[in-house]
UniProtKB/Swiss-Prot annotation:
GO terms for biological process: regulation of transcription by RNA polymerase II. InterPro entries: Znf_C2H2_sf, Znf_C2H2_type. May be involved in transcriptional regulation. Keywords: DNA-binding, Metal-binding, Nucleus, Repeat, Transcription, Transcription regulation, Zinc, Zinc-finger. Its main location: nucleus. It comes from Homo sapiens (Human). GO terms for molecular function: DNA-binding transcription factor activity, RNA polymerase II-specific; sequence-specific DNA binding; zinc ion binding. The gene is ZNF672. This is Zinc finger protein 672. Belongs to the krueppel C2H2-type zinc-finger protein family. A zinc finger (C2H2-type) spans 14-36, 42-64, 70-92, 99-122, 128-150, 163-185, 199-221, 227-249, 255-277, 283-305, 311-333, 339-361, 367-389, 395-417.
């Protein structure tokens, strides 16, 4: 039961008597010992399902009772499983650990980042004088000025960095800094001889500056994905990618926009969103001139002009211009609905539909009509509503020519035609059947009539 002194010193005092493996907690040891002796399973009295642990059985029984026992003490959000609550609380703890700047209120994830911010933004920086032209600059601007205004070989400053790059004007105070910088030129020029400490992949020949980067790259060849999601079992190459993926299950969005308050699950998504406030759209379409904040969005947009649909569904052959559209479409074949509302339990095929559904619970309707101030939770519903003000009726019925402002009303109208045709067919069939009943005996009385 109890481990050796070495295991105790390592913080694992509970040892398995069968294999000698040590654990930090007795509860973990008990679960491990069940793997040696019998199944030791726990059975649900309502449906007969068996669980490996008592905690799993309790979580399973809550699905019958519809309970949501685990409530976040910070924001009041409720969860069915304690594991999801732990992930959610980790986001609160991460935000609490951030270091705020007392001068401007900006927050940073750790103390070194805060100190660097204060040194760059709030502490008065002593100006540095260029020894060649006597102009004064900040430290970072001085290095840039010397590289541009005084090229290699023109400086006589004894305090200048002694290690200069042979490919560009940059200089470094240590040889290690120069060697690290030289990897940039190696990656940019494949014909240039590689530096001695470059790491090459034996499968595809690609080179990397660090062995750790090469190790991660080799996993792409082997297909190894060591970090598994406990909710859906999906594997990932890096733990950071797994953490971002788990936010799709918990609904956690720790990155908030300071301009409009909108929250995002990833910092990169927040940066792209902030460009919409700044009006920054550097990637323009050469065909129609529409601008985009990210190049990948431009590539997807250009497929509208070219008609390219490179992503095909293996089930039905339908093609799509965007991979994410294919992923959502394939769920219609599998019936998979991985995104679940934590308030009512309703499930959805994509996270965007879940976010729209959540607005119904919160009563949040951010899209307002400029004509009548009516608000909607989805922009598409606002677009349909505005057609009533503009008088647009682009959807025309092929049978009677009646026009409608949107296709949904046209579909409802066409069902009326279908019902009318069905009722007419039933009436005709009934009339024909009645006529046959009355004509049958009269025809049988005619001479020479026989029934086969």
């Amino acid at each position: 039961m109890f481990a050796t002194s070495g295991a105790v010193a390592a913080g694992k005092p509970y040892s398995c008597s069968e294999c000698g493996k040590s654990f930090c907690y007795s509860s973990v040891l008990l679960r491990h010992e069940r793997a040696h002796g019998g199944d030791g399973r726990f059975r649900c009295l309502e449906c007969g399902e068996r669980c490996a642990r008592a905690a799993d059985l309790r979580a399973h029984r809550r699905t019958h009772a519809g309970q949501t026992l685990y409530i976040c003490s910070e924001c009041g959000q409720s969860f069915r499983h304690s594991g999801r609550l732990d992930l959610h609380l980790g986001a609160h703890r991460q935000r609490c650990r951030t270091c705020p700047c007392r001068t401007c209120g900006r927050r940073f994830p750790h103390l070194p980042a805060l100190l660097l911010h204060r040194r760059r933004q709030h502490l008065p920086e002593r100006p540095r004088r260029c020894p060649l032209c006597a102009r004064t600059f900040r430290q970072s601007a001085l290095l840039f000025h010397q590289a541009r205004a005084h090229p290699l070989g023109t400086t006589s400053d004894p305090a200048a960095p002694p290690h200069r790059c042979a490919q560009c004007p940059r200089a470094f105070r240590s040889g290690a800094g120069l060697r690290s910088h030289a990897r940039i030129h190696v990656s940019r020029s494949p014909t240039r001889p590689r530096v001695s400490d470059a790491h090459q992949c034996g499968v595809c020949g690609k080179c990397f500056g660090k062995s750790s980067t090469l190790t991660r790259h080799l996993q792409t060849h082997s297909g190894e994905k060591p970090f598994k999601c406990p909710e859906c079992g999906k594997g990932f190459l890096e733990s950071a990618t797994l953490v971002r993926h788990q936010r799709t299950h918990t609904g956690e969005k720790p990155y908030a926009c300071g301009d409009c308050g909108r929250c995002f699950s990833e910092s990169s998504t927040l940066l792209r969103h902030r460009r919409s406030h700044q009006g920054e759209r550097p990637h323009a379409c050469a065909t129609c001139g529409k601008g985009f904040g990210q190049r990948s969005d431009l590539v997807v947009h250009q497929r509208i002009h070219t008609g390219e649909k490179p992503f095909a569904c293996p089930e039905c052959g339908r093609r799509f211009s965007d991979r994410s559209d294919l992923t959502k479409h394939r769920r219609t074949h599998t019936g998979e609905k991985p995104y679940r509302c934590e308030l009512c339990g309703k499930r959805f095929t994509c996270v965007s539909n879940l976010n729209v559904h959540r607005r119904n619970h919160a009563g949040h309707k951010p899209h307002k009509c400029p004509e009548c101030s009516k608000a909607f939770s989805v922009a598409s519903k606002l677009a349909l509503h505005r057609k009533t003000h503009l008088g647009e009726r682009p959807a025309e019925c092929a049978e009677c020519g009646k026009c409608f402002s949107h296709s949904r009303s046209l579909s409802q109208h066409q069902r009326a035609h279908t019902r009318a045709r069905t009722a007419a067919a039933v009436a005709i069939q009934s009339a024909v059947g009645t006529a046959l009943v009355f004509e049958g005996p009269a025809e049988q009385e005619k001479p020479g009539f026989s029934v086969s």
